Amino acid sequence: MIFLKRFIVWTFLFIVTLIQLLLYLPDFSCISKNGGLPICTSQFNFAIVDSSHITHDFITSIRELLRLLSYLTIDMGWSSGLPAPDAYNDENLVDTFHLNNIYKVNYFGYCKKNGKQKEYCTSNHSSGMDILALLVRDVGIQLGKLSSAYENNTEILGESLVFTYELSLSSLHTFIKGDRQRGNILPKIVTNQGNEQTDLEYSSSKAYDKGVSLAYGLMLFNEIMYFIHIFEITISVHCFLNVILFGFALVWGKKQILLPTLLKITSSLLLVFASISFSGNLLYLLLLKMLEPDPTGITTTGWEMLEVKAGSGFIITCIRVGIQWIFLPVAFITSNHYIQPKKQQTKIDELKSDDESTVKQV
């Protein structure tokens, strides 16, 4: 009867930890390099919209710049099988900022769709869910498709552009931070106004500084959340292994100190990092929602250019965190019930030492 009771307790712990561990598998979707329909349970989906005159002009300018880069790439190293005139068609050029594109973003990868046709999925690497780095990577991948040097491995150019973007952003942020301490010399040099600076020029330079700081903050935030999530998954694996070892201890029939203590520690750490990761994910999603256009048009800055929706992966994350909140008190109650009291352990140690001394005397 006692064995059956312990087996039921361990089975419950095993099933709960196994379920929460398996619910991490969708986080590794959206990274398939194969064609067809790769599975993608995204944390969120976003599309670019031109909701105002400002965003329309901004997006149009970027698209024209990417069109120019596409032409240069084709002229300097085009070697695909298409006829030369067809290579300059719009469908063969970089379309990162096309309004029909839908980006499905996950922790470790993203998928890009154009309407109902899914184009490709690739890994984010350490950039996490940073949408700016994602767009830069997409530009690099598409340029790689147009280049003879990278047409067989387009991810190389995408990763190179992301590395250049992050390095340039870090250097620019450091320079602007130092320039503030020197009295904003850069705007004065650029505008050639000496020590004088108009209100319009000052507001423009401040907006530029805020834009760089925002992009730099998003880059750091997503990198930190990326490594926190990896550590969270690692703790989840250790927690599952601890439950298995704890089950062997229950079957053996002896109360332990080490295994129940480890179970309490790993379950506590798991919930802490899972809560941090979930809170950061939710905060990031809410920040992106602020870049959506207001349907009423009451509150607007003119720069709302995203349409963001929570994905199926976010719902799975909510379920997983809920299971982990249930698992923590159960793990503590079970560990406290089957842990060996310190007094009893001390008494056992004393008896062992007495037996050893008796054996030596004999």
UniProtKB/Swiss-Prot annotation:
Disulfide bonds: none annotated. It is found in: Prospore membrane. Its main location: membrane. It is a multi-pass membrane protein. The chain crosses the membrane at residues 7-27, 233-253, 268-288, 313-333. Signal peptide: none annotated. Residues 1-6, 254-267, 334-362 are cytoplasmic. One of its GO terms (cellular component) is cytoplasm. Residues 28-232, 289-312 are lumenal. Keywords: Membrane, Sporulation, Transmembrane, Transmembrane helix. One of its GO terms (biological process) is spore membrane bending pathway. Belongs to the SMA2 family. Involved in spore and ascus formation. Required for the efficient assembly of the precursors of the prospore membrane to a continuous prospore membrane. This is Spore membrane assembly protein 2. The gene is SMA2.
